[in-house]
A protein has these predicted regions:
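Sec-dependent signal peptide recognition
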Residues: 2-10
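C-terminal motif of bacterial Sec signal peptides marking the signal peptidase cleavage site
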Residues: 13-16
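Extracellular calcium-associated, cysteine-rich motifs in secreted modular proteins
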Residues: 19-103
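A short beta-strand-turn-helix
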Residues: 110-131, 154-157
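Conserved redox-active cysteine motifs that mediate thiol-disulfide chemistry
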Residues: 128, 135-152, 174
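Hydrophobic beta-strand anchors of alpha/beta hydrolase catalytic cores
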Residues: 132-133, 218
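Short, internal strand/loop/helix patches
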Residues: 165, 180-223
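Thiol-/selenol-based redox modules, centered on thioredoxin-like
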Residues: 214-244
Length: 244
């Protein structure tokens, strides 16, 4: 979510648009332009433009002040969209992505899956990064073999706008992973990037439709969520560098 340029721009917009509705909603324009009635870091004028409550510092009740959410590009009106416990930055383009599909050259579909912190993670929140989606299971030894290496890649290329998201579809019992299972995977390989529960491979199957999936299966998205390749094994540094 993009922060408004300035309250002055808001005033100019209102003057240009006019109308009774604007007069009703913004009858406080004579007030101090910097007024922040609820102390949440957003001026009352900006709150009106965002549609947040100027008298409630946490409009959506998710535990984060409205100003903090705007600064970190989450949605202050959606109680399920807030800064990640894992510390992964949210791109300000998340609400601009227009999905076309999960085939090479298309713009990847949004997904929302539970991460290792028990929070909903949205793919499009990483719209400003190169994303490696790694489809894996606990019983897949090759998946485990590459997991630590992917963490190394993440550490090496994070500052260049790269992130890994592991799509864990089954635990050691071939059941849908619990949050505890996700945490165990994280601990096993010292992972700091997102690991999410892809129950029954629901997301993985959208990248490899009508085909027998051979794990590990890795899918690369360029910045802007364009699908670069799908279902590839043996990822090397050059695969990442060519998509940064």
């Amino acid at each position: 979510m993009k922060r408004l340029a300035s309250s002055a721009c808001v005033i100019a917009l209102l003057i240009a648009c006019g109308g009774e509705e604007a007069d009703h909603q913004f009858d406080w324009l004579g007030a101090d332009p910097g007024s922040d009635s609820d102390g949440d870091g957003l001026s009352d004028m900006d709150e009106a433009m965002y549609g947040t409550d100027p008298d409630n510092p946490d409009t959506d009740g998710d535990g984060f002040k409205d100003g903090a959410e705007v600064d970190q590009n989450s949605d202050p009106k959606n109680g399920n969209h807030f800064p990640y416990t894992g510390g992964w930055a949210i791109g300000d383009c998340w609400d601009d992505i227009e999905s076309t599909g999960n085939e090479v050259g298309q713009i990847a579909d949004q997904f929302e899956l539970i991460d290792q912190h028990g929070e909903q993670l949205r793919l499009h929140d990483f719209c400003d990064r190169t994303v490696l989606l790694s489809s894996a299971t606990f019983w897949c030894q090759p998946c485990m073999d590459e997991a630590a290496g992917f963490q190394d890649f993440y550490e090496d290329y994070e500052e260049e706008g790269f992130i890994v998201i592991t799509l864990l579809s089954e635990n050691a019992d071939s059941s849908t992973p619990t949050v505890e299972d996700l945490g165990a995977w994280v601990d096993l390989f010292g992972i700091t990037h997102p690991v999410v529960r892809d129950g029954r491979g629901s997301v993985t199957n959208t990248f490899v439709p009508d085909a027998q999936i051979v794990l590990p299966a890795n899918h690369m998205l360029k910045k802007g969520m364009e699908v670069s390749f799908v279902a590839r094994r043996d990822i090397v540094a050059a695969d990442i560098e060519s998509n940064l």
